[in-house]
């Protein structure tokens, strides 16, 4: 206490104005940071000349006392710098209170204070020249010794920083002393740029160190290379602290053990109904598959849809009941039974997919139910199952053939081929028309005789008409046939009796040759217009015609011979019979031609001559036939 009173008296004598108190505080801080300077001043320093010697000596004693106090503080070499600063800060508030009480006395000693101020500046300069062994680590430390005056609140902050430095030292050990010193210096620099309002806010923030981030407390290693923007960002970042949020979320327990949860993909062979089953409102679902032509194929999915319903037990508890269940067999295989349908299950590992199950609540809140680690795949159990038949129906509907336009490339021009075919058809048509015209022309020129007529509708109709004739006509025809047969027999008998006559035989042989030549020429003309079939049909008929003509000629010759040998009366009778037979045949032929509407050439034949020319008349008839 004695030392404190002496010190206060000396300060009152030395400092008269309040403005000089700030200089005293800065000087004390310099003395605390540089104790060597104070020891040099205690030894005597430089003695001034002229007036003011007593005042200078008093100042030297005061400095000696302050040095003595500092020497007491420095007796413990193991004490840290933070503790020394703390002790010096505790003495400063007492000095400030005593200085404020003696404001009235300070006015009288203004002149002495000014002289002491000049002396102190000289002492500081001399001390800095003598301290050649100590060097500053950075320019920031030199600036700290000559910083501007500070308010009491700033000094309190320094005390708090020193305390936090001690706490950090106790936590991290003595090896972090350098980092702590840098932290104190950076804190002082930041405080210089802050306003009093920011200082008050900073004091309130210092009371809650738990809200600060550890990365912001520890400064960077090289603060001298920091820019202004980085220096501003180095301020303390606070965690956002506000009123607690109150959200009401219904708690839903997870559906099961996460190890047993699996993810499945619903395919076309099975389905899941998310709505609970109700027999009153249940409606069967029908699925329609549309193929390419647009037809709809109805496919029912009633037997392989998983459904559930809520049932109450006897205790009154509600639980869910499903129509599906899993079955694991002794061999390790797993199957799903949906009613009467059986599906095989294959399991796959899905750890790499990172699948999680969440329940979505209101206001964007998700409740996790667990992680899904496996996948399941369903396949039909057999070829006779309903699911397999469903799959086959879908495949057939998709692969059904549709009518499409097919493109093909050919080397042949279809237009030219069509023209060639049309031309060939037209040529065939022309040839057929020409052939039909030629046949009609031949038929008109050479009509067929009655004997040569073939079976046809007209011929058969004529035969029916002949059946309708009366019995007399048939009887006359039979009589004519009998007469002709008798005539042939007589002719044969006559030939046998007259074989020995040579002249007659030569004449008869010459005449048929002439007739054959005539018929050959006519046949040549007919061959040019008739087909082979007509030639085949006509050739035997001509042969028969020739035979008949030869017979008529022979008959005529034989008749002449017989007339020469027999009586004229008998000959005339025979000739009359022959003429009557020929007339009957001609009448019969004419009647047949009239029924068919064919004009005969015999009607236009010239009139008959006298009986002396009977042979010639017979020959003319054969030629006409």
Curated annotation (Swiss-Prot):
Residues recorded with modification Phosphoserine: 203, 548, 570, 600, 605, 622
Gene Ontology cellular-component annotations: Cdc73/Paf1 complex; nucleus
Keyword annotations: Coiled coil, Flowering, Nucleus, Phosphoprotein, Transcription, Transcription regulation
Any Pfam family matching the protein: Leo1
Bias-annotated ranges (Acidic residues): 40-55, 63-80, 523-537, 548-561
Primary subcellular site in the record, as a coarse category: nucleus
GO biological process terms, semicolon-separated: flower development; negative regulation of flower development; transcription elongation by RNA polymerase II; vernalization response
Knockout mutant characteristics: Early flowering, defects in floral morphology in whorls 1-3, but fully fertile flowers. Reduced seed dormancy and increased germination rate of freshly harvested seeds.
Stretches for region Disordered: 1-214, 415-625
Ranges of biased composition (kind: Basic and acidic residues): 97-113, 121-137, 182-197, 415-425, 471-491, 538-547
Localization annotation: Nucleus
Extent of Basic residues compositional bias: 492-501
Bias-annotated ranges (Polar residues): 426-436
S-S bridge residues: none
Coiled-coil intervals: 415-539
Domain of life per record: Eukaryota
Tissues of expression: Expressed in roots, shoot apices, stems, cauline leaves, inflorescence apices and flowers.
Entry similarity comment: Belongs to the LEO1 family.
Function, in words: Component of the PAF1 complex (PAF1C) which is involved in histone modifications such as methylation on histone H3 'Lys-4' (H3K4me3). Involved in regulation of flowering time. Required for the expression of the flowering repressor and MADS box gene FLC. Involved in the control of seed dormancy and germination.
Assembly description: Component of the nuclear PAF1 complex (PAF1C), which consists of VIP2/ELF7/PAF1, VIP3/SKI8/WDR61, VIP4/LEO1, VIP5/RTF1, VIP6/ELF8/CTR9 and CDC73. Interacts with VIP3 and VIP6.
Name of the protein described by the UniProt record: Protein LEO1 homolog
Gene (name only): VIP4
